[in-house]
């Protein structure tokens, strides 16, 4: 076997690989010898079929396998000897297309190598950790929000008109073209005006109604309505108003606490404080992580594989286009060109991705089975009733596993770096933390 370098520019590599006919023949014979003990053929005992006959019968079939294995072996040996790591799957092409049995096999292999990653002294990285305490005002605000969610309704004075936010208890019958339709009627139905729980335009027409009043509400079902026989059609709902009720906030006391699973109000406040501080810590970590990535990005410089940058830039452009065009759910659109800004962001992401991968490998950072299981379960909760199917899907899908593993690995590498960096704490207000978070999104 002969390997000759044809290209070595930056990270681009090219090689010609020649596998001699004799090597191929030896590989075929090797595979025949391996299979011989199990082969049965009429006129011969099992395992006693002559090699010449086996080669005549199976040689042609094994030649393709032998060729692929020999080329794969040559590539693996090249990467082992050179230390190169291809950024993407190498491009391999047979150059003697008129090849016939008995000829040498000539193959051209090209790829982009991953760059050498420079050493990073993490002890001189300075980071700021923002600390926010859950003060009484924040706890009281959270309690007030809980009280609103636990609000009740009490009947308004007789003759009062319904306002936005009121609850209207009613019977209604819906008709399309004068005919009642299935699912279009109900009795004693409590509807909170402004909740947007009914189709657009329905609740607005009930603002101002009184108890014991009857009102016809005319609406048009959305074109994308779930029930196809109603989509886009006009309907008239005859509503008989039984009660108009105003919202009453729940009292902030031990009874409210018990509704949310706490023993008393003091215990609920303690739970809220813990939850708030966990939220603040998560936000603070996001800000510090950005600071760390900025510091690393400024600290290192190395060549980047153009193919990785190009793929990442296209992915960024595609994602941003869909965010700006949320009504398009499929990929049935023209090609989205990556801009210079997309490419600049892609270079940063690729550079940091390669650096973190290298640092994680050197630190022997691993994602445990328990961490993967937790991540899969977290994703599975988005598909109620289909958790088992989702779990099985992930187990059979290496690409999905990698999508779940990557952010866990990155966070563990970040923790590893932070543990060695110089970290100073700075206590700030909740509002200042929010501003720091918003600044991340604005960048």
From Swiss-Prot:
Residues 165-250 form the PPIase FKBP-type domain. One of its GO terms (biological process) is protein folding. GO terms for molecular function: peptidyl-prolyl cis-trans isomerase activity. Keywords: Cell cycle, Cell division, Chaperone, Cytoplasm, Isomerase, Rotamase. The keyword Metal-binding does not apply. GO terms for cellular component: cytoplasm. InterPro entries: PPIase_dom_sf, PPIase_FKBP_dom, Trig_fac, Trigger_fac_C, Trigger_fac_C_sf, Trigger_fac_ribosome-bd_bac, Trigger_fac_ribosome-bd_sf, Trigger_fact/SurA_dom_sf. It catalyses: [protein]-peptidylproline (omega=180) = [protein]-peptidylproline (omega=0). Its EC number is 5.2.1.8. It is found in: Cytoplasm. Involved in protein export. Acts as a chaperone by maintaining the newly synthesized protein in an open conformation. Functions as a peptidyl-prolyl cis-trans isomerase. Consists of 3 domains; the N-terminus binds the ribosome, the middle domain has PPIase activity, while the C-terminus has intrinsic chaperone activity on its own. Belongs to the FKBP-type PPIase family. Tig subfamily. This is Trigger factor. It comes from Ruegeria pomeroyi (strain ATCC 700808 / DSM 15171 / DSS-3) (Silicibacter pomeroyi). The lineage of its organism: Bacteria, Pseudomonadati, Pseudomonadota, Alphaproteobacteria, Rhodobacterales.
């Amino acid at each position: 076997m002969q390997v000759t370098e044809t290209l070595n520019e930056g990270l681009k590599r090219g090689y010609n690989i020649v596998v001699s006919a004799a090597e191929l023949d030896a590989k075929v014979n090797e595979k025949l010898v391996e299979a011989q003990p199990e082969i049965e053929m009429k006129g011969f005992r099992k395992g006693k079929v002559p090699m010449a006959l086996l080669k005549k019968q199976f040689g042609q079939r094994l030649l393709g396998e032998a060729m692929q294995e020999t080329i794969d072996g040559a590539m693996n040996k090249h990467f082992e000897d050179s230390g190169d790591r291809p950024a993407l799957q190498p491009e391999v092409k047979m150059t003697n297309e008129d090849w016939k049995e008995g000829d040498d096999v000539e193959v051209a292999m090209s790829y982009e190598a991953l760059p050498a990653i420079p050493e990073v002294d993490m002890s001189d990285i300075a980071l700021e950790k923002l600390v926010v305490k859950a003060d009484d005002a924040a706890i009281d605000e959270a309690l007030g929000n809980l009280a609103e969610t636990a609000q009740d309704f009490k009947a308004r004075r007789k003759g009062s008109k319904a306002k936005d936010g009121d609850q209207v208890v009613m019977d209604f019958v819906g008709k399309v073209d004068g005919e009642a339709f299935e699912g279009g009627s109900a009795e004693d139905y409590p509807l909170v005006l402004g909740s947007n729980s009914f189709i657009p335009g329905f609740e607005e027409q009930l603002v101002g109604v009184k108890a014991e009043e009857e009102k016809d509400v005319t609406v048009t079902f959305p074109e994308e309505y779930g029930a196809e026989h109603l989509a886009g059609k006009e309907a008239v709902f005859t509503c008989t108003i039984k009660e108009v009720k105003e919202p009453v906030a729940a009292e902030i006391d031990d009874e409210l606490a018990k509704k949310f699973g706490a023993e008393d109000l003091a215990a609920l406040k303690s739970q809220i404080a813990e939850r708030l501080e966990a939220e603040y810590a998560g936000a603070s970590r996001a800000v510090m992580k950005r600071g760390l990535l900025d510091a690393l990005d400024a600290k290192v410089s190395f060549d980047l594989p153009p193919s990785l940058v190009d793929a990442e830039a296209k992915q960024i452009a595609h994602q941003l286009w869909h965010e700006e065009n949320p009504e398009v759910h499929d990929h049935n659109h023209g090609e989205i060109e990556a801009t210079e800004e997309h490419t600049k962001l892609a270079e940063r992401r690729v550079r940091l991705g390669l650096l973190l991968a290298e640092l994680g490998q050197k630190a022997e950072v691993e994602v445990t089975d328990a961490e993967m299981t937790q991540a899969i379960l977290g994703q599975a909760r988005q598909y109620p009733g289909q958790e088992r199917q989702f779990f099985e899907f992930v187990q059979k899908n290496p690409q999905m596993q990698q999508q779940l593993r990557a952010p866990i690995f990155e966070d563990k590498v970040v923790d590893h770096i932070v543990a060695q960096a110089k970290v100073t704490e700075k206590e700030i207000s909740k509002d200042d933390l929010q501003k720091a978070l918003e600044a991340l999104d604005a960048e």
